[in-house]
Swiss-Prot record:
Record organism: Morinda citrifolia
UniProt-recorded Gene Ontology molecular function terms: lipid binding
Top-level taxonomy: Eukaryota, Viridiplantae, Streptophyta, Embryophyta, Tracheophyta
Signal peptide: none
InterPro entries, sorted: Bifun_inhib/LTP/seed_sf, Bifunc_inhib/LTP/seed_store, Plant_nsLTP
Coiled coil: none
Protein's UniProt keywords contain Transport: yes
SUPFAM superfamilies for this protein: Bifunctional inhibitor/lipid-transfer protein/seed storage 2S albumin (SSF47699)
Disulfide bonds: C14-C29
Domain of life, per lineage: Eukaryota
Described purpose of this protein according to its UniProt entry: Plant non-specific lipid-transfer proteins transfer phospholipids as well as galactolipids across membranes. May play a role in wax or cutin deposition in the cell walls of expanding epidermal cells and certain secretory tissues. Has antibacterial activity against Gram-positive bacteria S.aureus and S.epidermidis and blocks biofilm formation. In a mouse model, also protects against bacterial sepsis and has an anti-inflammatory effect. Exhibits antinociceptive activity upon oral or intraperitoneal application in mice.
Name of this chain's protein: Non-specific lipid-transfer protein
Example of a GO biological process term: lipid transport
Protein family according to the UniProt entry: Belongs to the plant LTP family.
Length: 33
């Protein structure tokens, strides 16, 4: 299992994209996921 803190830190750069606020995911989002 992956620790929740690690998941949230990996997904935090993606949140605006995942919630429809960004056109493209950030590069660090793709690298983290």
């Amino acid at each position: 299992a992956v620790p929740c803190g690690q998941v949230s830190s990996a997904l935090s750069p993606c949140m605006s994209y995942l919630t429809g606020g960004g056109d493209d995911p950030e590069a660090r989002c793709c690298a983290g996921v």
